[in-house]
């Protein structure tokens, strides 16, 4: 089934409850496979960001709200001007662009640390559940 048909078939299916993000899997040795997508391990906090009617709620992978801890991320996500559910990771980058988990744990909103939200996946857009589409199309 083509992408357009999949979108039309599933356009009214909504995501109505908290979604636990997929987590990385540890392996015994490195491998390469064209059927897999490889991503950087950022060493941050996994987060699901829900943007709805110009309101943003950021959840940890366990469902804890993170808005109070990372208001700059919520403010930035509001600027998207779309309703969306985004899976990503909150990190603090050091001067070399590497994630620093210790600095993330110590993060204070006024600290000037380089706080970022790296999006991995778009789960819904403007009320449409798009999880049925292949990751590379989302």
Positions of predicted regions on the chain:
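Catalytic cores of nucleic-acid ligases and guanylyltransferases
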Residues: 1-138
């Amino acid at each position: 089934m083509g992408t357009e048909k999949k979108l039309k078939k599933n356009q009214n299916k909504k995501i109505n409850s908290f979604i636990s993000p997929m987590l990385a899997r540890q392996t015994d040795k490195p491998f390469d496979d064209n059927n897999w997508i490889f991503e950087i391990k950022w060493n941050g906090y996994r987060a699901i960001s829900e943007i709805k009617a110009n309101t943003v709620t950021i959840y940890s992978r366990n469902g804890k709200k993170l808005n109070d801890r990372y208001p700059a991320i919520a403010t930035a996500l509001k600027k998207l001007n779309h309703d969306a559910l985004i899976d990503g990771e909150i990190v603090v980058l050091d001067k070399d662009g590497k994630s620093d988990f210790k600095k993330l744990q110590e993060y204070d909103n006024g600290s000037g640390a380089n706080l970022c939200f790296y999006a991995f996946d778009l789960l819904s857009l403007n009320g449409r559940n798009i999880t049925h589409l292949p990751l590379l199309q989302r």
